[in-house]
Amino acid sequence: MKESLRLRLDQLCDRHEELTALLADAEVISDNKRFRKLSREHSDLNEIVDVWSKYRQAEEDIETAESMLSDPDFKDMAQEEIKENRALIEQLEGDLNILMIPKDPNDANAAYLEVRAGTGGDEAAIFSGDLFRMYSKYAESRGWRIEVLSENEGEHGGYKEVICRVDGDGVYGRLKFESGAHRVQRVPATESQGRVHTSACTVAILPEVDVDTTVEINPADLRIDTYRASGAGGQHINKTDSAVRITHVPTGVVVECQEERSQHKNKAKAMALLVSRLENAKRAAQETATSEMRRDLVGSGDRSERIRTYNYPQGRMTDHRINLTLYKLDAIMEGDLTELLDSLHREYQADQLAMLAQENGG
């Protein structure tokens, strides 16, 4: 193992000890926000510290066994112990490499899911509805909660646009590779000739960020409009102007929330979405400025990048980033995304390991 990696692992162990002491401090315990933040950092380090401890113990066991090789009575046993511990070290080093992949601090957060109809008119809107239902079913299977913030329904079903908040354990980390253009090939219900049409929708996944600790927003930069919210066909029409639209004038970012009957609640939810959008834009700009914007194998998350095709006549789904084709489209559209998302995460992990090896000259 490289000396630089050993040094980093020792530093992480020191930090873990420091966090253990801090979490027992009465002042920290009384500060709920700080306590939660430090608890999460402590939890993230637990496995690394445990594996590194086992690695060092295996090295010590090899040293002890090597000192016994000169004794004929213990030579065979010592050789066997050396062999076993070398195999263990190889396995633990692989585990440590994976654990040392930089974690996205937003992975544990809730997320905003945005689905928009692209090319294809009514059929694109209908497919937006199908995608939203697919994600809703998956969220339900994970015990996550979905809260619709705004929706613009299509004339013949589905959505021109739907934006929701998905709350639960590790939502953003699980869904973040879904951003991009999703293409569908199928025969629309309105097609009398049986011809296959191609339509597209875009999906964006944004991590929810803490309103108090991120970008500062000058109230003077905001234009806040209220309007009367209404659903298709006159459903849940509000008789007061409770829907809220907030425009961040310097950037032109616009957010809306119309689902609550209370204008105050709609404004609070719209502000939370605005902060997440601005923070996401800021982070993307920083990454562009500080790196070569290397496009990972799994993709950049650019919503214009075509990432997936859903082919109904063939019953298949193809993810173009990792050349994965699954012939179980019906199950996928019912929310069975585990195999797909696991494959994307494995590919991303392999990509990150290759990057680390390159950076470490190996």
Curated annotation (Swiss-Prot):
Keyword Cytoplasm in record: yes
Database matches in InterPro entries: PCRF, Pep_chain_release_fac_I, Pep_chain_release_fac_I_sf, Prokaryotic/Mito_RF, RF-1
SUPFAM superfamilies: Release factor (SSF75620)
A molecular-function term among this protein's GO annotations: translation release factor activity, codon specific
Subcellular location: Cytoplasm
Main location: cytoplasm
Keyword Amino-acid biosynthesis recorded: no
SMART domains according to UniProt: PCRF
Annotated keywords: Cytoplasm, Methylation, Protein biosynthesis
Post-translational modification: Methylated by PrmC. Methylation increases the termination efficiency of RF1.
Domain of life: Bacteria
Pfam families (alphabetical): PCRF (PF03462), RF-1 (PF00472)
Gene Ontology CC entries for this record: cytoplasm
N5-methylglutamine modifications at: Q235
Functional description taken from the UniProt entry: Peptide chain release factor 1 directs the termination of translation in response to the peptide chain termination codons UAG and UAA.
Similarity remark: Belongs to the prokaryotic/mitochondrial release factor family.
Protein name: Peptide chain release factor 1
Gene: prfA
